[in-house]
């Protein structure tokens, strides 16, 4: 299965991008998770904004977790959506759901 069948959404679901379009993922000092897209004029999408979620920061390797999940799902059959969620008991997590 190719990465075009894997999609990544913002935490509020307002934007969804193809995982194959992502060329980089980062986390800044505020805990914002951003994805840099390979087309356009250096477009970025903020996937998680912990400031609006009462300042709960994601784990320091949260952006690496996304890369790992995309790699795993790229070999799976079917189409998937990955999105960050803030769980009160467990903090920030990546939720994966079939499409």
Map each language-model feature to its residues.
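Eukaryotic intrinsically disordered, low-complexity regulatory linkers and tails enriched in Ser/Thr/Pro
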Residues: 1-16, 20-99
